[in-house]
């Protein structure tokens, strides 16, 4: 004979891992080709010149230069572009 009452199962008790979404490089920052600029779900930001879009809508730099965020078009879409500029090397 059981001396403990059977415990009921619960439907809660799990959590998903964090996805670390968001802007990784901000306007005016220098980026190298291949650096991730924005991790997002869907196209919250659209790729402009010098920016590529990955399979999961991640925006990344195709060229090195300065990041610029702009809003344009009828729908006021946010675009990320790269202004190709040579980085000033620090004299050391």
From Swiss-Prot:
An MF annotation (GO) of this entry: structural constituent of ribosome
Pfam families recorded: Ribosomal_L27
Keyword field: Ribonucleoprotein, Ribosomal protein
Cystines in this chain: none
GO biological process terms on file: translation
A GO-annotated cellular component: cytosolic large ribosomal subunit
Domain of life, source organism: Bacteria
Keyword Acetylation set for record: no
Disordered: region residues: 1-20
Family from the record: Belongs to the bacterial ribosomal protein bL27 family.
Protein name: Large ribosomal subunit protein bL27
Organism: Legionella pneumophila subsp. pneumophila (strain Philadelphia 1 / ATCC 33152 / DSM 7513)
Lineage: Bacteria, Pseudomonadati, Pseudomonadota, Gammaproteobacteria, Legionellales
């Amino acid at each position: 004979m059981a001396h403990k009452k059977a415990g009921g199962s619960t439907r809660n008790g799990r959590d998903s891992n964090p996805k670390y979404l968001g802007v990784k490089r901000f306007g005016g920052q220098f980026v190298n080709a291949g650096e991730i600029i924005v991790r997002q779900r869907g196209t919250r930001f659209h790729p402009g010149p010098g920016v590529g879009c990955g399979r999961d809508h991640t925006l990344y730099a195709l060229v090195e230069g300065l990041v610029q965020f702009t809003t344009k078009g009828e729908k006021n879409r946010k675009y990320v572009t790269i202004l190709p500029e040579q980085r000033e090397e620090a004299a050391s």
